[in-house]
C-alpha cells in the first residue's frame, strides 16, 4: 500500500479552499447575460469555447492533490445541479464558494463546525420554503420562451424555438437537439409514431426520388416472432390482396424465403408490402409492439398469448392513415386506435416512469409516452463553424432542461433576486438556531444568497455593493437587469429563473459546503519518488569465489 500524506486542521482547510477558489473563479466568469466565455484546450481538434458552467468545471484538475480535492468537491456541486435541473450550475458553484469561504472564516475564529453546518441547513430549508411561496406557474408560450431565452444566455431565437417545440408536441413530448447543416436554427416536428428501424429490403421502395416507401391507408401486421416461412403468412396476404390495401409487417425479423417471396410479389404488383424489424430489444420490444397495437387498433400476434400467424385475420391487423419508411426510420401517421385506449396506455407508462429507478429507463419510457401522445420535435442548431456549433448546441440543451424545470415547478424572479427576497424574509421572520454558533451558520447562508446577484453585476462591469443594496431596498420581483443596465420588475421584463433550478443550486451548494466546513483531516497518496537503481553492480563480489577451488 502506498504511503500517505496527511494534513490536519487549518493546514488542510487552507489547501482545500485554494482548490475551491481556482475552480469557482473559472466557472463564475460565465454567470449572467454579460458573462464571459471560457476557452478549453482539447488534446485533439480545435479548442472548445463555452459559457456553460458545468463544462468548465469538468475540465479542471489541479496538480496539488489537496487543492484538487477541494476543486473536485465543488465540481460535484455543479454536476449534481446539472443532473437535477439541467441548469444553475454556475449559480450553485458561486453559492458553494461563498458558503465555504465564510464558513471556514468562522471555523478559524473558533466556531463549532457542526453547529455552523446545522445553522446553514436550517437557513436553506427556510429559503426553499420561501422560494416555493414566490414561485408562479409557467405554462403559457411567452413565459416558456422567456425562460428558454434567459437560460440560453439571452438568445431570443432559442427561447422561441423551445416554446414552439413544446407547443407542438406538448410539455411531455420528446424534444431533441441536433447539429444542423445550415446557418439558421430550425425546428422539425415529426407527427405520429417514429421508431429507428428502416426497411428490410430496398426492393420495397416505391418513391425512388426520395429513396423511401409510402403506404396509404395500410393494414399493419404486428408479430412478436421471426418470420422465415411464407406459408404462415399466406392467409393474411390473400385477405389483404382481396381488400386491395397495402400491408406493413412489423416483426422481430423477416428473413429467407418469406422476405424473398414478399419482395417478388411487391415487384410484380400482386400485393403492396413493406417489412421492418420491430423497435427495441427483449421486453422493451414487446412493450413497444403493444404501443403500436394500441395506436393502430391492432393485435400483437404472439405465441405467448396463444395467437398464431396462420390463424390471423384482417380483424387482428392495425390500420393507419399513412406510413413512411426510409433506410433508418419508420413513421406511422394517424393510427386508427381508440383515443380512450391510447390515453389508458399513456397513463400506464407514466406510472412506470414514476416507479423507474434508472435515468435511462425513465428516458426510454418518456419517449414512448411522447410517441403515443403526439410526436417528436427536433431542434436543429445552425452555426457558421464547428466550434460555434458545439457551444450553441450545449446552450440550447441547457435551455431545454431549464424550460422543462420551469414547467414542472414554476418560475421565480431571475437575476439573483429570488434568493435575495428569500434571505430578507428569513431575516424578518427572525430564524434562530439553538446556540450562537448556529446563528452564525444562518448568517453565512443568508450572506451567500446575495452572491449570485453580486457576481452577475461584477460580470456586467458594475459596482456590486451599490446595486445589491438598491435591490435589497426594493420589494417583490424588483431587481437589476444587467443586460439593459436598468432596474425594474424582473418578471415583467421577462427575466425568470425556474424555481427548481434555483432550489437545486442552493440545496446542493449547501450540502457540499457543509461537508467541507466540517472537514478536519485530508489524506492523499504521497507522490512516488524515483525508483531505486537496481543495477547489477553487486555481482562483483563473486570474484572471491575463486578461493573455492
Swiss-Prot record:
Protein's UniProt keywords contain Cytoplasm: yes
MF terms in GO: ATP binding; ATP-dependent protein folding chaperone; isomerase activity; unfolded protein binding
Tree of life domain: Bacteria
SUPFAM superfamilies xrefs: GroEL apical domain-like, GroEL equatorial domain-like, GroEL-intermediate domain like
Catalyzed chemical reaction(s): ATP + H2O + a folded polypeptide = ADP + phosphate + an unfolded polypeptide
UniProt-listed Enzyme Commission number(s): 5.6.1.7
Family: Belongs to the chaperonin (HSP60) family.
Function (record text): Together with its co-chaperonin GroES, plays an essential role in assisting protein folding. The GroEL-GroES system forms a nano-cage that allows encapsulation of the non-native substrate proteins and provides a physical environment optimized to promote and accelerate protein folding.
Protein name as it appears in the record: Chaperonin GroEL
Source species of the chain: Pectobacterium atrosepticum (strain SCRI 1043 / ATCC BAA-672)
Classification lineage: Bacteria, Pseudomonadati, Pseudomonadota, Gammaproteobacteria, Enterobacterales
Amino acid at each position: 500500500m502506498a504511503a500517505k500524506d496527511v494534513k490536519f486542521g487549518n493546514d488542510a482547510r487552507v489547501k482545500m479552499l485554494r482548490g475551491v477558489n481556482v475552480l469557482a473563479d473559472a466557472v463564475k466568469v460565465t454567470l449572467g447575460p454579460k458573462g464571459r466565455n471560457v476557452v478549453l484546450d482539447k488534446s485533439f481538434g480545435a479548442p472548445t469555447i463555452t459559457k456553460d458552467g458545468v463544462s468548465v468545471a469538468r475540465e479542471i484538475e489541479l496538480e496539488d492533490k489537496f487543492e484538487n480535492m477541494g476543486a473536485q468537491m465543488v465540481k460535484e456541486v455543479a454536476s449534481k445541479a446539472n443532473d437535477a435541473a439541467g441548469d444553475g450550475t454556475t449559480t450553485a458553484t458561486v453559492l458553494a464558494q461563498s458558503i465555504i469561504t465564510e464558513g471556514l472564516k468562522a471555523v478559524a475564529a473558533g466556531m463549532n463546525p457542526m453547529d455552523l453546518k446545522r445553522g446553514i441547513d436550517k437557513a436553506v430549508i427556510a429559503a426553499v420554503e420561501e422560494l416555493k411561496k414566490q414561485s408562479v406557474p409557467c405554462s403559457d408560450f411567452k413565459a416558456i420562451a422567456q425562460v428558454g431565452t434567459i437560460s440560453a444566455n439571452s438568445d431570443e431565437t432559442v427561447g422561441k424555438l423551445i416554446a414552439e417545440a413544446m407547443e407542438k408536441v406538448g410539455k411531455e413530448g420528446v424534444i431533441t437537439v441536433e447539429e444542423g447543416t445550415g446557418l439558421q436554427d430550425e425546428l422539425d416536428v415529426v407527427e405520429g409514431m417514429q421508431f429507428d428501424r428502416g426497411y428490410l429490403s430496398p426492393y420495397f421502395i416505391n418513391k425512388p426520388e426520395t429513396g423511401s416507401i409510402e403506404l396509404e391507408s395500410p393494414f399493419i401486421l404486428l408479430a412478436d416472432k421471426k418470420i422465415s416461412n411464407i406459408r404462415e403468412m399466406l392467409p393474411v396476404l390473400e385477405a389483404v390482396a382481396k381488400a386491395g390495401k397495402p400491408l406493413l409487417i412489423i416483426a422481430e425479423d423477416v428473413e429467407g424465403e418469406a422476405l424473398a417471396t414478399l419482395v417478388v410479389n411487391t415487384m410484380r404488383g400482386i400485393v403492396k408490402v413493406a417489412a421492418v424489424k420491430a423497435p427495441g430489444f427483449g421486453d422493451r420490444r414487446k412493450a413497444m409492439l403493444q404501443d403500436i397495437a394500441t395506436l393502430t387498433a391492432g393485435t400483437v400476434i404472439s405465441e405467448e398469448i396463444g395467437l398464431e400467424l396462420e390463424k390471423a385475420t384482417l380483424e387482428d391487423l392495425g390500420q393507419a392513415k399513412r406510413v413512411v419508411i426510409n433506410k433508418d426510420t419508420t413513421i406511422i401517421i394517424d393510427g386508427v386506435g381508440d383515443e380512450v385506449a391510447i390515453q389508458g396506455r399513456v397513463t400506464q407508462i407514466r406510472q412506470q416512469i414514476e416507479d423507474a429507478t434508472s435515468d435511462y429507463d425513465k428516458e426510454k419510457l418518456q419517449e414512448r409516452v411522447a410517441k403515443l401522445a403526439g410526436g417528436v420535435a427536433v431542434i436543429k442548431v445552425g452555426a457558421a463553424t464547428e466550434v460555434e456549433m458545439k457551444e450553441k448546441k450545449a446552450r440550447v440543451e441547457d435551455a431545454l432542461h431549464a424550460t422543462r424545470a420551469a414547467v414542472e415547478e414554476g418560475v421565480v424572479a431571475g437575476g439573483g433576486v429570488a434568493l435575495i427576497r428569500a434571505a430578507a424574509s428569513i431575516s424578518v421572520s427572525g430564524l434562530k438556531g439553538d446556540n450562537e454558533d448556529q446563528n452564525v451558520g444562518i448568517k453565512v447562508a443568508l450572506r451567500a444568497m446575495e452572491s449570485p446577484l453580486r457576481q452577475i453585476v461584477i460580470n456586467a462591469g458594475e459596482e456590486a455593493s451599490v446595486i445589491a443594496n438598491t435591490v435589497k431596498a426594493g420589494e417583490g420581483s424588483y431587481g437589476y437587469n444587467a443586460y439593459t443596465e436598468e432596474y425594474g420588475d424582473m418578471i415583467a421584463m421577462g427575466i425568470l429563473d425556474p424555481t427548481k433550478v434555483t432550489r437545486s443550486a442552493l440545496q446542493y451548494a449547501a450540502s457540499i459546503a457543509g461537508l467541507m466546513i466540517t472537514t478536519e483531516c485530508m489524506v492523499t497518496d504521497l507522490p512516488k519518488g524515483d525508483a531505486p537503481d537496481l543495477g547489477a553492480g553487486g555481482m562483483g563480489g563473486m570474484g572471491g569465489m575463486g578461493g573455492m577451488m
